[in-house]
Amino acid sequence: MTTPGTIIFLNGTTSSGKSSVLNHLQPMLAWPFLDAGIDKFIWMLPARYLNERELWDTVLGHAASAGPLGHTLFSGMHHAIAALARAGNHILADHVLVEPIWMQECAMLFHELPAYLIGIRCPLDVIEQRERERADRTLGQARKQYDLVHAHGIY
């Protein structure tokens, strides 16, 4: 029987520093950890879904809730992370858990695996400054997510 891999799951608002933490942590870890974060799954979509209107309306929703395709995509992400870990892979993943059902689904899928859910928090003024400085961000998104992403469970 394969020993399951460890899951390190980072949750926080957009622009909170999740990807930066992941990118700094990954090369420092003793074992190879796969990057199975939210952006990797979003970029699997066909290009037509990645334009700003489709991405927000169909996939990500409007900052505080997911669009219809987002529910399917991110449920698949959660199941894929669990399957990869059960096959013995170590996983690093960052996410924006705006939907309570996503936290519940991850808890159900990861409960028999060595998994760590880590909240990435940053002061709102810092997040909003980062949001303004980055060309790929929608202004106001971080503020809408700020309290929501950490409201669905405890770390």
Predicted regions and their residues:
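Phosphate-binding P-loop
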Residues: 1-5
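The conserved Walker
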Residues: 13-14
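Conserved substrate/cofactor phosphate-moiety recognition/catalytic segment
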Residues: 26-76
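Glycine-rich phosphate-binding loop used to anchor ATP phosphates in small-molecule kinases
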Residues: 64-113
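Conserved phosphate-donor/acceptor-positioning beta-strand/loop module used by diverse small-molecule
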Residues: 110-133
